[in-house]
Amino acid sequence: LSFGVVEPAGTRHLLALDVSASMSGGEIAGVPGLSPSAATAALAVVAARTEPWTAVMGFSDRFRDLGLTARDRVDEATRKVSGLTFGSTDASLPMTWALQNKIQVDTFVVMTDNETWAGNIQPVQALEKYRQATGIGAKLIVVGMTSTGFTIADPDDAGMLDVVGFDGATPALMAKFAKGEI
């Protein structure tokens, strides 16, 4: 990946990386030999280096800061997101955490390898609750590292996008969506 070719969206990003055990094995759609955790780490580094405000958090049944920064190399970031085992995976945590902690977010990015709803509220409902409570027209980008036919984003909501797989165009696509260009 080349960090210089990604134009920033200029929005406040909250990246939520699935850190469940399944992310360390297998391959992602589009890049044979690349694990889901390594791909999410690479995307997180790109966002941290290009966006003016980016928080990178890990999730499964809990939500926590991964300590990943713009200064991290991809291999360092991969170490920070690999081997963390929590319980079941709850993709609503980014929105509920931001709401509870009064964090202003324009773009939530959830990176996972499979359908993830193990909580009390579905991610789509959590986003709507966040939007209503904050007045922010927050967007949701779900990056599915493996193609399992799932969707977390609501296909009828223009503020939500599902992306499956990974290639060099993924960061630019995400930035354009966050800016409202697509």
Label for each model-derived stretch:
Residues 1-182:
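Acidic, glycine-rich A-domain
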